[in-house]
Amino acid sequence: MFKKILIANRGEIACRVIKTARKMGIQTVAIYSDADANALHVKMADEAVHIGPPPANQSYIVIDKVMDAIRETGAEAVHPGYGFLSENPKFAEALEAEGVAFIGPPKGAIEAMGDKITSKKIAQDADVSTVPGYMGLIEDAEEAVKISQEVGYPVMIKASAGGGGKGMRIAWNDNEAREGFQSSKNEAASSFGDDRIFIEKFVTQPRHIEIQVLSDGQGNTIYLNERECSIQRRNQKVIEEAPSPFLDEETRRAMGEQSCALADAVGYASAGTVEFIVDGDKNFYFLEMNTRLQVEHPVTELITGVDLVEQMIRVAAGEKLSIQQSDVQRNGWAMESRLYAEDPYRGFLPSIGRLTRYRPPAEIAETGRAVRNDTGVFEGGEISMYYDPMIAKLCTWAPDRAAAIEEMRVALDSFEIEGIGHNIPFLAAVMDHPKFISGDMTTAFIEEEYPEGFEGVTLDEPTLRRIAAASAAMHRVAEIRRTRISGRMSHHERHVGSDWVVKLQGQSFPVSIAADPDGATTTFEDGAALRVESDWMPGQPMAVLSVDGAPLILKVDSGTSGFRVRYRGADLEATIRTPRQAELAARMPEKLPPDTSKMLLCPMPGLIVKVDVVEGEEVQEGQALCTVEAMKMENILRAEKKGVVAKINAAAGDSLQVDDVIMEFE
C-alpha cells in the first residue's frame, strides 16, 4: 500500500480524499494556488505545495507544476478528484512516465471515454443503448446550424471533452444553435483545453440516471446501483438521490449490466460512472462515462456501505476487489443537496465573498438516520470567483425516501451560512415540492416548476400562523431585553405590552401573548392559541422553537420593528407593532425603489468577455448585448425589450461587481 499520496485538486473533494487516506494510514500532500493558501484542504493535509496564481489554467491544471510538486514531496500516487486533471490522459501518461501511480483508470480508458464521440462509438459496439446524433467534428457555427437542422431540433450541443454541465447548450432553432456552438466552444477551451464540439438529438422530458461501476482491471467489474440526478439547472446537478424512485429491478439490472460491459470494453480499472438519460417508458440511452469519482458519490456510499475512495486507492495499488456483485447492498435511501454560492432570487447568479458565518448541522451516523456534510470551506474563509461555486454537499440517509427527505429538510433548516448568497432556500423549497415528494420529475423540473426563476415560497395559512406566533414570542423577549438596557432607573423600565400585530406575507395577525417561565401562549383574533417554547436570545441568527409541540427552526435577522425570517424557501419580513403603530403604519405611503428599467446591470461579479452592441444601435427583445464570465461559466445578457443603446460603460476584459451599470438605454 502507498505511504504518501498527492491530491491534485482542491476544495471539498480534496478534503474527502484526505479523510479516507488518513483512515488508511496514508500521508497526504495538498496543492494550492494563491487564492487557496488558507483553504481547508491545505490545513488538513500533512504537506502542502504552492503551485501558482489563482486561475486554474495557471495552477491546478498545469501538469508540469503538479509533477514538480510530486517530485518535491516524494508522493507515490496521485488522486485527481473530479474536474481539473481528473480526466486528462496526458496527466495519466506523465504520471506513468514518472513511475507514480494514478488513482484512476488507465490512460486508454480515459482517452476513449473522455472523447464523447469515440465513447459513443465504443458504447454502440458494446451493445449499449445510445442517442442518435452527429459524431463528426464541427468546424464552425454555420456547420453546427446545418447539422442541427439535419438531426432535427431540439439538439444538445456538447463539448467532446466536457463534463459538469460546462460546454453544453440546448438549441431549439438556428440562432440558438449558432450562439450555443460558440459559447460551448469557448467554455470547452477555457475549462478543458479542448474546443471540439459534437451535436446529438435532445431527448425531451428525460430523467438523468447514472450507474456507479467499480473494476479492478483483473476481471472483476461490478455496479453499485444507480443514482437519480434529474434535478438539474443548466445541466448542472443540484439534488441527487440513491436509489432512483423510478427504476424497477429489471431496468436497474439491464442498465447495470450494460455499464459493466462498457467498462470491460475499455479495460477499465477504478471507480467510474456511466450516465444515461431515461424516458417515461424506461427506455435508457447512453450519455457519457465519467472516468473519475463523481461529485455525488456519497449517496452511493450511504446505501451500499462501500467507501469508493478507498476502493480506488486499493485498485491503484494493485489489489483485487474484495466485493462481488452479490455483496452489493441497497440499504435505505440517501439524498444529496449541493449547496452553491449563488443567489436563487437573482437567477442563481454566482456569489463571492467571505463566509462570515458557516455552521453546518451536526454530522450523524446512527441507527435509522444519518447526516453527512462534505465540504472544503470554513467560517471566515473566502468563496473565490476562480473556481466552482459549490460550498458543500449535504447528505442524509434514512430507511425510506420520505424519511430521507424529512431528514434533509431538518438539516437544511439547521444549516447557517452568512456573508454570501446561497441556494439553501431553493433546496428547501424543492424538498417540499409535491412533484419531488412523489418522485415525478425530469431534467426539466426546475425550468418547468420555476419558469420565472425562484421567487421564494408562498407559505400556507397554518404555517404563517406558526411563524407569527413564534415571531411575536421572540419579539417579546427582545423588547424585554431592550427595556433592561434602556438607561432608565431600576423598577422604572418601559412596560412591555401583551397585544401585538404581526404582519407576514402581506397578512396581518393581531395576537395577544401570555408568558410564563417556560414559554408563551400566543392567542389569535379568532381565539386559536399556539404554545411557543424556545431558549432563543436576541442576536442569535437561528431560532429553534417548539410550537404546539412541533419543532420549528427559523433563520432570523433582527430589525427595528421585527425580524427577517427565512423558512423552507420563504424569505419573509415579520413586522411586529403595537395595534396603534400598525394602524398608523397602514396609512404611510410605500417608498418606491430606484428606476433601473433603462439600464443593463451586471447580475453577478464577473469578467466581460465581449460586448455585442455599440452606442446608438437599436436592439430587439432577446438580442445578445454582452457576455459575462463567472465561476467558469459564460452568461449571455440579453435585451429585455426593444430599445436604443445610449451609453456603454464597460468593455471586454473589465471586471465588474453586482449591479454595476454595463450600458444605458434611451
Question: Residue spans of the language-model regions?
Answer:
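Conserved nucleotide-binding/hydrolysis modules and their immediate coupling elements
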Residues: 307, 515-519, 525-542, 546-553, ...
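Short flexible coil/turn linkers enriched for glycine and charged/polar residues
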Residues: 149-153, 162-164, 193-194, 205-207, ...
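Short amphipathic alpha-helical segments
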Residues: 3, 166, 243, 388-394, ...
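N-terminal beta-alpha lobe that positions the nucleotide/phosphoryl donor
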Residues: 1-274, 278-297
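Catalytic P-loop NTP-binding/switch module of NTPases
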Residues: 551, 557-602
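Structured functional modules or segments
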Residues: 591-666
